[in-house]
């Protein structure tokens, strides 16, 4: 049996905002150099800065985050983070980003850990506030993430766009690279279809428990770390968001982000 421990932090005035502001929140950005489709992508130049710096700066703009740390096992990435004045921790080599985060979180004194992917240079700081809000509303929430409605048909069949189905209480039922749910009878019309926005927040204790658990068959089959939590019975609160995610997975993705950030409205 997995037992998750948590601490209830009373709000100073009883509001969700006050409760969140009373929590010590650390944002961790896992970054690795190796990538089958785009090696070295954290250091890829985007508008004169490495991608990891764009992510770091945007996360640092969140007023609820006390500290931002890049977690990497690569000295080249660590050196570049030091050069732009960021905080970085060198870790052991890990199979997953969750395990990398847990190594760093074990050394931290904080309430919540926010996991921001190192290949999301367009991350909006407002998304962090949305992911953290459920912890103030419900002390039983251990892990949160975000999702939004699919608007482009191509996203449904793209395996790099992870789909999610959510129960009536707002908890994730399943994540998949395949289209879910399956529409057996087209005459009934499609229900709302949602994609996962890959930002997570954890109570520190929950992250440590999750990292201690064995990888699971579905996690390996889909190559989705969040399925480890679901298979072990850890519920993930899913929050619908207006913010989108744009992970850089391919050279084509990188060129698109470069165009967006080179435009005046997209300047970082």
Question: What kind of region is each of these model predictions?
Answer:
Residues 1-19:
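N-terminal amphipathic/basic-hydrophobic helices that include classical n-h-c signal peptides
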Residues 18, 189-268:
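Conserved alpha/beta core of the MobA/IspD/sugar-nucleotide pyrophosphorylase nucleotidyltransferase superfamily
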Residues 65, 110, 138-141, 234:
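Short, high-confidence coil segments that cap the C-terminus of an alpha-helix
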Residues 72-73, 123, 202, 249:
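A conserved hydrophobic position in a structured secondary element of the catalytic/binding core
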Residues 125-216:
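Conserved core of the sugar-phosphate nucleotidyltransferase
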